Protein backbone atom coordinates (compact mmCIF):
# COMPACT_ATOMS: atom_id res chain seq x y z
CA UNK A 1 0.00 0.00 0.00
CA UNK A 2 2.81 2.36 0.95
CA UNK A 3 4.63 1.48 -2.28
CA UNK A 4 1.47 2.22 -4.29
CA UNK A 5 1.13 5.63 -2.62
CA UNK A 6 4.76 6.51 -3.37
CA UNK A 7 4.39 5.49 -7.02
CA UNK A 8 1.13 7.45 -7.29
CA UNK A 9 2.73 10.55 -5.81
CA UNK A 10 5.68 10.21 -8.19
CA UNK A 11 3.33 9.80 -11.17
CA UNK A 12 1.39 12.92 -10.19
CA UNK A 13 4.61 14.88 -9.69
CA UNK A 14 6.12 13.90 -13.01
CA UNK A 15 3.12 13.63 -15.28
CA UNK A 16 0.33 15.53 -13.56
CA UNK A 17 2.49 18.65 -13.42
CA UNK A 18 3.47 18.23 -17.05
CA UNK A 19 -0.11 17.75 -18.19
CA UNK A 20 -1.25 20.81 -16.28
CA UNK A 21 1.37 23.13 -17.67
CA UNK A 22 1.07 22.40 -21.41
CA UNK A 23 -2.02 24.49 -22.08
CA UNK A 24 -1.11 25.91 -25.49
CA UNK A 25 1.27 24.37 -28.00
CA UNK A 26 2.03 26.33 -31.16
CA UNK A 27 3.79 23.38 -32.76
CA UNK A 28 0.67 21.20 -32.41
CA UNK A 29 -1.85 23.90 -33.30
CA UNK A 30 -3.06 23.07 -36.82
CA UNK A 31 -5.20 26.22 -37.05
CA UNK A 32 -2.77 28.88 -35.73
CA UNK A 33 -5.43 31.55 -36.22
CA UNK A 34 -3.22 34.17 -34.54
CA UNK A 35 -0.99 34.22 -37.62
CA UNK A 36 -3.82 36.22 -39.21
CA UNK A 37 -3.12 38.94 -36.64
CA UNK A 38 0.51 39.74 -37.42
CA UNK A 39 -0.41 43.20 -38.80
CA UNK A 40 2.01 44.51 -41.45
CA UNK A 41 4.16 41.37 -41.10
CA UNK A 42 1.30 39.01 -41.95
CA UNK A 43 1.81 36.54 -44.78
CA UNK A 44 -0.30 37.37 -47.84
CA UNK A 45 -1.30 33.73 -48.38
CA UNK A 46 -3.02 33.74 -44.98
CA UNK A 47 -4.80 37.09 -45.39
CA UNK A 48 -5.90 37.18 -49.04
CA UNK A 49 -9.58 36.84 -49.86
CA UNK A 50 -11.09 33.58 -51.05
CA UNK A 51 -14.27 34.84 -52.76
CA UNK A 52 -12.78 36.98 -55.52
CA UNK A 53 -13.48 34.22 -58.07
CA UNK A 54 -17.17 35.01 -57.55
CA UNK A 55 -16.89 38.75 -56.85
CA UNK A 56 -15.11 39.75 -60.06
CA UNK A 57 -17.90 38.45 -62.31
CA UNK A 58 -20.40 41.21 -63.17
CA UNK A 59 -23.33 40.10 -65.37
CA UNK A 60 -23.49 41.89 -68.74
CA UNK A 61 -20.30 43.82 -67.97
CA UNK A 62 -16.81 43.59 -69.45
CA UNK A 63 -13.61 44.77 -67.73
CA UNK A 64 -11.87 47.60 -69.58
CA UNK A 65 -9.13 49.03 -67.39
CA UNK A 66 -7.16 48.01 -64.30
CA UNK A 67 -5.23 50.13 -61.79
CA UNK A 68 -3.10 48.46 -59.08
CA UNK A 69 -1.26 49.81 -56.03
CA UNK A 70 0.90 46.96 -54.71
CA UNK A 71 2.98 46.79 -51.57
CA UNK A 72 6.24 44.88 -51.99
CA UNK A 73 6.35 41.22 -51.02
CA UNK A 74 7.76 39.60 -47.89
CA UNK A 75 11.07 41.16 -46.93
CA UNK A 76 13.95 40.82 -44.49
CA UNK A 77 13.91 42.82 -41.24
CA UNK A 78 15.41 46.26 -40.73
CA UNK A 79 19.08 46.63 -39.85
CA UNK A 80 18.24 47.24 -36.18
CA UNK A 81 16.52 43.84 -35.88
CA UNK A 82 19.21 41.95 -37.82
CA UNK A 83 21.85 43.43 -35.51
CA UNK A 84 19.94 42.04 -32.51
CA UNK A 85 20.37 38.41 -33.64
CA UNK A 86 22.85 37.83 -30.82
CA UNK A 87 20.27 39.05 -28.30
CA UNK A 88 17.79 36.50 -29.65
CA UNK A 89 20.38 33.77 -29.09
CA UNK A 90 20.87 35.00 -25.50
CA UNK A 91 17.13 34.89 -24.90
CA UNK A 92 16.93 31.40 -26.42
CA UNK A 93 19.65 30.12 -24.10
CA UNK A 94 18.07 31.77 -21.06
CA UNK A 95 14.66 30.22 -21.79
CA UNK A 96 16.14 26.75 -22.27
CA UNK A 97 18.12 27.17 -19.03
CA UNK A 98 14.94 28.19 -17.21
CA UNK A 99 13.28 24.94 -18.28
CA UNK A 100 16.19 22.48 -18.27
CA UNK A 101 18.36 23.72 -15.39
CA UNK A 102 16.54 26.18 -13.13
CA UNK A 103 13.21 24.33 -13.44
CA UNK A 104 11.25 27.59 -13.33
CA UNK A 105 8.61 26.58 -15.86
CA UNK A 106 5.16 27.72 -14.71
CA UNK A 107 2.64 25.18 -13.46
CA UNK A 108 0.16 26.28 -16.15
CA UNK A 109 0.53 27.67 -19.65
CA UNK A 110 4.16 26.60 -20.05
CA UNK A 111 5.89 25.81 -23.33
CA UNK A 112 5.13 22.32 -24.60
CA UNK A 113 8.04 19.98 -25.29
CA UNK A 114 7.68 20.43 -29.06
CA UNK A 115 7.98 24.22 -28.80
CA UNK A 116 10.81 24.03 -26.27
CA UNK A 117 12.87 21.59 -28.36
CA UNK A 118 12.30 23.65 -31.50
CA UNK A 119 13.45 26.79 -29.68
CA UNK A 120 16.50 25.00 -28.31
CA UNK A 121 17.52 24.03 -31.86
CA UNK A 122 16.88 27.49 -33.35
CA UNK A 123 19.77 29.36 -34.96
CA UNK A 124 19.90 32.70 -36.70
CA UNK A 125 20.54 32.48 -40.45
CA UNK A 126 24.00 34.06 -40.67
CA UNK A 127 23.56 34.72 -44.38
CA UNK A 128 21.16 37.51 -43.37
CA UNK A 129 23.50 40.43 -42.75
CA UNK A 130 22.80 44.11 -41.97
CA UNK A 131 23.70 45.19 -45.52
CA UNK A 132 20.69 43.13 -46.73
CA UNK A 133 18.19 45.02 -44.57
CA UNK A 134 14.64 45.00 -45.93
CA UNK A 135 15.59 43.02 -49.06
CA UNK A 136 12.84 41.05 -50.77
CA UNK A 137 12.95 37.35 -49.85
CA UNK A 138 12.32 34.39 -52.13
CA UNK A 139 8.85 34.15 -50.58
CA UNK A 140 8.33 37.82 -51.37
CA UNK A 141 9.16 37.11 -55.00
CA UNK A 142 6.58 34.32 -55.04
CA UNK A 143 4.02 36.62 -53.39
CA UNK A 144 4.12 38.93 -56.39
CA UNK A 145 4.22 36.15 -58.94
CA UNK A 146 1.11 34.76 -57.29
CA UNK A 147 -0.92 37.98 -57.37
CA UNK A 148 0.01 38.64 -61.01
CA UNK A 149 -0.93 35.10 -61.98
CA UNK A 150 -4.27 35.28 -60.17
CA UNK A 151 -5.35 38.66 -61.52
CA UNK A 152 -4.34 37.63 -65.04
CA UNK A 153 -6.45 34.50 -64.67
CA UNK A 154 -9.46 36.62 -63.68
CA UNK A 155 -8.94 39.37 -66.27
CA UNK A 156 -7.19 37.81 -69.28
CA UNK A 157 -8.80 40.29 -71.69
CA UNK A 158 -7.16 43.23 -69.86
CA UNK A 159 -3.96 41.76 -68.40
CA UNK A 160 -2.59 40.61 -71.73
CA UNK A 161 0.30 38.16 -71.87
CA UNK A 162 2.20 40.22 -74.42
CA UNK A 163 4.04 43.25 -73.06
CA UNK A 164 3.51 46.58 -74.81
CA UNK A 165 4.95 49.77 -73.32
CA UNK A 166 1.97 51.86 -74.43
CA UNK A 167 -0.61 49.39 -73.09
CA UNK A 168 1.13 48.79 -69.74
CA UNK A 169 2.63 51.33 -67.31
CA UNK A 170 4.74 50.16 -64.37
CA UNK A 171 6.42 52.21 -61.69
CA UNK A 172 8.21 51.41 -58.44
CA UNK A 173 10.07 53.28 -55.72
CA UNK A 174 13.83 53.43 -55.45
CA UNK A 175 14.33 50.35 -53.27
CA UNK A 176 15.50 46.79 -53.87
CA UNK A 177 12.27 45.28 -52.51
CA UNK A 178 9.95 47.23 -54.83
CA UNK A 179 12.25 46.83 -57.84
CA UNK A 180 12.35 43.06 -57.35
CA UNK A 181 8.59 42.99 -56.72
CA UNK A 182 8.09 44.67 -60.11
CA UNK A 183 10.32 42.05 -61.74
CA UNK A 184 8.45 39.18 -60.07
CA UNK A 185 5.07 40.58 -61.12
CA UNK A 186 6.10 41.09 -64.75
CA UNK A 187 7.89 37.72 -64.90
CA UNK A 188 4.57 36.12 -64.02
CA UNK A 189 2.55 38.21 -66.50
CA UNK A 190 4.85 37.94 -69.51
CA UNK A 191 7.31 35.12 -68.80
CA UNK A 192 10.82 35.27 -67.38
CA UNK A 193 12.54 36.62 -70.48
CA UNK A 194 10.39 39.72 -70.97
CA UNK A 195 11.35 43.27 -71.85
CA UNK A 196 9.01 45.06 -69.45
CA UNK A 197 10.42 48.35 -68.18
CA UNK A 198 9.34 50.61 -65.36
CA UNK A 199 8.93 54.37 -65.56
CA UNK A 200 12.05 56.41 -64.86
CA UNK A 201 12.44 57.28 -61.19
CA UNK A 202 11.94 61.01 -60.52
CA UNK A 203 14.34 62.94 -58.31
CA UNK A 204 11.51 63.58 -55.84
CA UNK A 205 8.92 60.82 -55.89
CA UNK A 206 5.88 62.69 -54.60
CA UNK A 207 3.57 60.19 -56.30
CA UNK A 208 4.70 57.05 -54.44
CA UNK A 209 6.57 58.54 -51.48
CA UNK A 210 4.81 61.85 -50.69
CA UNK A 211 5.47 61.46 -46.96
CA UNK A 212 9.20 61.93 -47.59
CA UNK A 213 8.55 65.55 -48.59
CA UNK A 214 6.02 66.66 -45.97
CA UNK A 215 7.61 68.15 -42.85
CA UNK A 216 4.32 68.61 -40.94
CA UNK A 217 3.62 64.89 -41.36
CA UNK A 218 7.11 63.97 -40.13
CA UNK A 219 6.70 66.37 -37.20
CA UNK A 220 3.45 64.65 -36.20
CA UNK A 221 5.43 62.36 -33.90
CA UNK A 222 3.59 59.17 -33.00
CA UNK A 223 6.36 58.20 -30.59
CA UNK A 224 6.02 60.96 -28.02
CA UNK A 225 5.13 60.11 -24.43
CA UNK A 226 1.46 61.02 -24.78
CA UNK A 227 0.80 59.14 -28.02
CA UNK A 228 -2.00 56.59 -27.81
CA UNK A 229 0.33 53.67 -28.48
CA UNK A 230 2.69 54.72 -25.69
CA UNK A 231 -0.20 55.25 -23.28
CA UNK A 232 -1.36 51.74 -24.22
CA UNK A 233 2.11 50.39 -23.45
CA UNK A 234 1.84 51.85 -19.96
CA UNK A 235 -1.53 50.21 -19.37
CA UNK A 236 -2.24 47.38 -16.93
CA UNK A 237 -3.25 45.15 -19.86
CA UNK A 238 0.06 45.60 -21.68
CA UNK A 239 2.22 45.13 -18.60
CA UNK A 240 0.23 42.13 -17.40
CA UNK A 241 0.73 40.59 -20.84
CA UNK A 242 4.49 41.14 -20.66
CA UNK A 243 4.49 39.46 -17.24
CA UNK A 244 2.45 36.49 -18.51
CA UNK A 245 4.81 35.97 -21.46
CA UNK A 246 7.86 36.21 -19.19
CA UNK A 247 6.35 33.66 -16.81
CA UNK A 248 5.50 31.34 -19.71
CA UNK A 249 9.16 31.44 -20.73
CA UNK A 250 10.31 30.55 -17.21
CA UNK A 251 11.53 33.97 -16.08
CA UNK A 252 10.82 34.97 -12.49
CA UNK A 253 10.84 38.63 -13.41
CA UNK A 254 9.19 40.60 -16.21
CA UNK A 255 11.27 40.92 -19.35
CA UNK A 256 11.80 44.36 -20.85
CA UNK A 257 9.25 45.29 -23.47
CA UNK A 258 11.97 45.62 -26.12
CA UNK A 259 13.01 41.97 -25.63
CA UNK A 260 9.46 40.65 -25.84
CA UNK A 261 8.78 42.79 -28.92
CA UNK A 262 11.99 41.50 -30.52
CA UNK A 263 10.80 37.90 -30.07
CA UNK A 264 7.40 38.87 -31.47
CA UNK A 265 8.99 40.55 -34.50
CA UNK A 266 11.16 37.58 -35.41
CA UNK A 267 8.16 35.26 -34.92
CA UNK A 268 6.21 37.28 -37.50
CA UNK A 269 9.07 37.57 -39.97
CA UNK A 270 9.96 33.88 -39.88
CA UNK A 271 6.32 32.86 -40.23
CA UNK A 272 5.97 35.06 -43.32
CA UNK A 273 9.22 33.76 -44.83
CA UNK A 274 8.03 30.15 -44.69
CA UNK A 275 4.24 30.04 -44.53
CA UNK A 276 4.01 26.25 -44.54
CA UNK A 277 6.30 25.91 -41.50
CA UNK A 278 6.19 27.26 -37.96
CA UNK A 279 8.42 29.92 -36.45
CA UNK A 280 9.72 28.61 -33.14
CA UNK A 281 9.49 32.09 -31.61
CA UNK A 282 5.73 32.17 -32.13
CA UNK A 283 5.49 29.48 -29.46
CA UNK A 284 6.38 32.13 -26.88
CA UNK A 285 2.94 33.71 -27.28
CA UNK A 286 -0.57 32.43 -26.70
CA UNK A 287 -3.32 33.60 -29.10
CA UNK A 288 -4.82 36.11 -26.60
CA UNK A 289 -1.38 37.65 -26.08
CA UNK A 290 -0.98 38.11 -29.84
CA UNK A 291 -4.30 39.99 -29.85
CA UNK A 292 -2.89 42.44 -27.30
CA UNK A 293 0.19 43.00 -29.46
CA UNK A 294 -1.92 43.35 -32.59
CA UNK A 295 -3.83 46.24 -31.04
CA UNK A 296 -0.58 48.05 -30.19
CA UNK A 297 0.49 47.83 -33.83
CA UNK A 298 -2.93 48.94 -35.08
CA UNK A 299 -2.84 51.92 -32.73
CA UNK A 300 0.58 52.90 -34.03
CA UNK A 301 -0.43 52.75 -37.68
CA UNK A 302 -3.87 54.31 -37.08
CA UNK A 303 -2.18 57.54 -36.02
CA UNK A 304 0.87 57.27 -38.26
CA UNK A 305 -0.88 56.44 -41.56
CA UNK A 306 -4.59 56.09 -40.82
CA UNK A 307 -7.58 58.06 -39.62
CA UNK A 308 -5.96 59.13 -36.36
CA UNK A 309 -4.45 62.19 -38.03
CA UNK A 310 -6.19 64.35 -40.66
CA UNK A 311 -2.99 64.90 -42.61
CA UNK A 312 -2.81 61.20 -43.56
CA UNK A 313 -5.89 61.48 -45.79
CA UNK A 314 -4.17 64.30 -47.71
CA UNK A 315 -0.81 62.64 -48.41
CA UNK A 316 -1.91 60.47 -51.34
CA UNK A 317 -3.68 63.22 -53.26
CA UNK A 318 -1.59 62.58 -56.39
CA UNK A 319 -2.10 58.82 -56.48
CA UNK A 320 -5.89 59.20 -56.10
CA UNK A 321 -5.91 61.71 -58.96
CA UNK A 322 -3.80 59.29 -61.00
CA UNK A 323 -6.26 56.43 -60.38
CA UNK A 324 -9.34 58.49 -61.29
CA UNK A 325 -7.67 59.94 -64.38
CA UNK A 326 -6.59 56.49 -65.55
CA UNK A 327 -9.98 54.86 -65.05
CA UNK A 328 -11.84 57.79 -66.59
CA UNK A 329 -9.75 57.98 -69.75
CA UNK A 330 -10.36 56.05 -72.96
CA UNK A 331 -6.71 56.44 -73.93
CA UNK A 332 -3.83 54.05 -73.30
CA UNK A 333 -2.38 52.67 -71.10
CA UNK A 334 -5.09 50.22 -70.08
CA UNK A 335 -3.11 48.88 -67.12
CA UNK A 336 -1.16 50.83 -64.52
CA UNK A 337 0.68 49.08 -61.68
CA UNK A 338 2.60 50.79 -58.88
CA UNK A 339 4.93 49.04 -56.41
CA UNK A 340 5.42 50.84 -53.11
CA UNK A 341 5.21 50.52 -49.33
CA UNK A 342 3.00 50.24 -46.24
CA UNK A 343 2.83 54.00 -45.80
CA UNK A 344 1.49 54.41 -49.32
CA UNK A 345 -1.12 51.65 -49.07
CA UNK A 346 -2.44 52.72 -45.67
CA UNK A 347 -2.62 56.43 -46.51
CA UNK A 348 -4.39 55.51 -49.76
CA UNK A 349 -7.07 53.74 -47.71
CA UNK A 350 -7.34 56.86 -45.53
CA UNK A 351 -7.77 59.08 -48.59
CA UNK A 352 -10.52 56.82 -49.99
CA UNK A 353 -12.37 56.35 -46.69
CA UNK A 354 -11.93 52.57 -46.67
CA UNK A 355 -12.01 50.57 -43.39
CA UNK A 356 -12.94 53.65 -41.37
CA UNK A 357 -14.40 53.11 -37.91
CA UNK A 358 -17.14 55.23 -36.37
CA UNK A 359 -14.96 55.79 -33.30
CA UNK A 360 -11.22 56.44 -33.06
CA UNK A 361 -8.86 53.81 -31.72
CA UNK A 362 -7.42 54.85 -28.35
CA UNK A 363 -5.31 53.39 -25.58
CA UNK A 364 -8.43 52.84 -23.49
CA UNK A 365 -10.85 51.10 -25.84
CA UNK A 366 -9.05 47.84 -26.62
CA UNK A 367 -12.02 45.70 -25.56
CA UNK A 368 -14.74 47.66 -27.34
CA UNK A 369 -12.75 47.89 -30.61
CA UNK A 370 -12.21 44.15 -31.02
CA UNK A 371 -14.40 44.20 -34.16
CA UNK A 372 -12.73 47.31 -35.58
CA UNK A 373 -12.42 47.89 -39.30
CA UNK A 374 -8.89 49.30 -38.99
CA UNK A 375 -6.96 46.04 -38.75
CA UNK A 376 -3.65 46.38 -40.52
CA UNK A 377 -3.43 42.60 -40.78
CA UNK A 378 -6.31 42.74 -43.27
CA UNK A 379 -5.34 46.06 -44.85
CA UNK A 380 -1.59 45.85 -45.26
CA UNK A 381 0.03 42.39 -45.09
CA UNK A 382 3.20 41.70 -47.03
CA UNK A 383 2.30 42.04 -50.75
CA UNK A 384 -0.92 43.85 -49.83
CA UNK A 385 -2.62 45.32 -52.88
CA UNK A 386 -5.45 47.63 -53.85
CA UNK A 387 -6.98 47.03 -57.28
CA UNK A 388 -9.54 49.15 -59.15
CA UNK A 389 -11.28 47.56 -62.15
CA UNK A 390 -13.38 49.61 -64.57
CA UNK A 391 -16.26 47.79 -66.31
CA UNK A 392 -18.40 48.67 -69.31
CA UNK A 393 -21.96 47.39 -68.84
CA UNK A 394 -24.28 47.11 -71.85
CA UNK A 395 -27.50 46.12 -70.07
CA UNK A 396 -27.35 48.70 -67.29
CA UNK A 397 -30.54 50.82 -67.43
CA UNK A 398 -28.87 54.01 -66.18
CA UNK A 399 -25.14 53.83 -65.55
CA UNK A 400 -23.05 51.90 -68.05
CA UNK A 401 -19.68 52.46 -66.36
CA UNK A 402 -19.00 50.58 -63.12
CA UNK A 403 -16.01 50.05 -60.83
CA UNK A 404 -15.08 47.37 -58.30
CA UNK A 405 -12.35 48.04 -55.74
CA UNK A 406 -10.46 45.04 -54.34
CA UNK A 407 -8.29 45.04 -51.23
CA UNK A 408 -6.15 41.91 -50.98
CA UNK A 409 -8.54 40.00 -53.25
CA UNK A 410 -11.63 41.05 -51.28
CA UNK A 411 -14.22 43.31 -52.89
CA UNK A 412 -14.40 46.54 -50.88
CA UNK A 413 -17.95 47.00 -49.61
CA UNK A 414 -18.43 50.79 -49.54
CA UNK A 415 -21.81 51.87 -48.22
CA UNK A 416 -22.50 53.95 -51.33
CA UNK A 417 -21.93 51.01 -53.67
CA UNK A 418 -24.06 47.92 -54.31
CA UNK A 419 -22.31 44.85 -52.87
CA UNK A 420 -18.95 46.22 -54.01
CA UNK A 421 -20.13 47.38 -57.45
CA UNK A 422 -19.92 51.18 -57.72
CA UNK A 423 -21.31 53.55 -60.33
CA UNK A 424 -18.46 55.43 -61.96
CA UNK A 425 -20.28 58.76 -61.63
CA UNK A 426 -20.61 58.15 -57.89
CA UNK A 427 -16.89 57.40 -57.60
CA UNK A 428 -16.08 60.72 -59.28
CA UNK A 429 -18.54 62.56 -57.04
CA UNK A 430 -17.25 60.98 -53.83
CA UNK A 431 -13.65 61.90 -54.56
CA UNK A 432 -14.35 65.23 -56.24
CA UNK A 433 -12.67 67.11 -53.40
CA UNK A 434 -9.39 65.36 -54.30
CA UNK A 435 -9.85 65.28 -58.08
CA UNK A 436 -10.29 69.05 -58.38
CA UNK A 437 -7.69 70.16 -55.87
CA UNK A 438 -4.11 71.36 -56.29
CA UNK A 439 -2.09 68.54 -54.77
CA UNK A 440 0.98 70.74 -54.28
CA UNK A 441 -0.83 72.58 -51.49
CA UNK A 442 -3.40 69.92 -50.51
CA UNK A 443 -1.16 66.91 -49.93
CA UNK A 444 0.86 68.54 -47.15
CA UNK A 445 -1.28 71.05 -45.24
CA UNK A 446 0.71 73.30 -42.95
CA UNK A 447 3.72 73.85 -45.24
CA UNK A 448 2.80 77.48 -45.74
CA UNK A 449 2.38 78.02 -42.02
CA UNK A 450 5.71 76.41 -41.28
CA UNK A 451 7.59 78.39 -43.89
CA UNK A 452 5.91 81.58 -42.67
CA UNK A 453 6.95 81.09 -39.05
CA UNK A 454 10.54 82.45 -39.38
CA UNK A 455 9.17 85.47 -41.24
CA UNK A 456 6.56 86.19 -38.58
CA UNK A 457 9.20 85.90 -35.87
CA UNK A 458 11.44 88.34 -37.74
CA UNK A 459 8.56 90.79 -38.14
CA UNK A 460 7.76 90.53 -34.44
CA UNK A 461 11.36 91.25 -33.49
CA UNK A 462 11.50 94.19 -35.90
CA UNK A 463 8.28 95.70 -34.48
CA UNK A 464 9.59 95.26 -30.95
CA UNK A 465 12.78 97.08 -31.87
CA UNK A 466 10.83 99.96 -33.44
CA UNK A 467 8.60 100.31 -30.37
CA UNK A 468 11.69 100.27 -28.16
CA UNK A 469 13.33 103.05 -30.19
CA UNK A 470 10.13 105.14 -30.16
CA UNK A 471 9.99 104.86 -26.38
CA UNK A 472 13.59 106.04 -26.18
CA UNK A 473 12.72 109.12 -28.24
Which stretches of residues belong to each language-model region?
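Sec-dependent signal peptide recognition
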Residues: 2-9, 456-460
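Signature for phosphate-centric chemistry
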Residues: 20-169, 173-448
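Positively charged n-region of N-terminal signal peptides that target proteins for export
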Residues: 1-4, 471-473
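Cleavable C-terminal sorting propeptides in eukaryotic secreted/cell-surface proteins
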Residues: 450-473
Amino acid sequence: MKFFMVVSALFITLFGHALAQFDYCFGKDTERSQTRQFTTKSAYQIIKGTNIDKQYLVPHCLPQKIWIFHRHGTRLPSRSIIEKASRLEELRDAIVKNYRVLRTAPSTNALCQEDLIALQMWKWNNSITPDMEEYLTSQGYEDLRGTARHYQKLYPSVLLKEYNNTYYLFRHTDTQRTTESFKAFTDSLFGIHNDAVAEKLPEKDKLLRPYDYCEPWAANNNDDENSEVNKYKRSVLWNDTLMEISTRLGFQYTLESKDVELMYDICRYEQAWQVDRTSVWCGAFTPPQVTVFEYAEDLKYYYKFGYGSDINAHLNCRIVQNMIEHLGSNALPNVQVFFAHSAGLQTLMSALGINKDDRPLTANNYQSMSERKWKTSNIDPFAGNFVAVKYECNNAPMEKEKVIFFLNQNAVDLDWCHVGLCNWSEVVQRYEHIINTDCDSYYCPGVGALSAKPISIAVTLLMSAIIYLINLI
